[in-house]
Amino acid sequence: MRNLIFTLLFLTVFTSIFAQEVQVIQWFNLISDEVKFDDPFEKLTEGQIYDLSYIAKMRMLQERKPGSVGAESLKTIKEKEKKLTAEGVDIEGLLAQRAAITELRTKRAEAVVDSLNGLYVRMIGYLLPLDFEGKNGVEFLLVPWVGACIHTPPPPQNQIVYIKFDKGYETSSLFAPVWVEGILRTKSLTKELFLVDGISEINVGYAMSPSLIEGY
């Protein structure tokens, strides 16, 4: 009886410890908070961003090739400048920050969370197959939304996990919704995604060889 009690106690403690080691994470957990900055463009509406982009494009054309922008386009520029100014948009200030903000956005998209490296995690996502053995996929990209990398541009690389699953996971469609469970690695990779119209190179910030893939 004493041995039975000891065995049950051991199994209970072991199961509890193992359960605590599995960390359920969300996609936002993969985004590093080390690259912080105030992005003034995030405060603009879609219409304001469009108008600002139009102004920047026309100015660039005029600068590269004087006289290439017609009278009608110049009139449109003036109208958009007047409209944005009335809305409180600092046109010159924003255009001057474009290069710096673009660089910071790139750094933020590439930055991974180093503290996640080596942790046993469980997360949800959509499988985009890269390679098959028979009917089973053995390499995938785990992405946060349906259509990523094919119907929409690729997510930032810290929002893509490269999955290598030697056991193979049978899937009859793209973007199968799944739970994956395994040791997460911070690893910068570039994977080739074969599309109907060519090959797309996808930058990835994380990798995993899961112990488990299951549909949901």
What are the residue ranges of the model-derived segments?
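OB-fold and OB-like single-stranded nucleic-acid-recognition modules
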Residues: 19-216
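Contiguous, function-dense segments enriched for cysteine-driven chemistry
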Residues: 16
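Sec-dependent N-terminal signal peptides
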Residues: 4-13
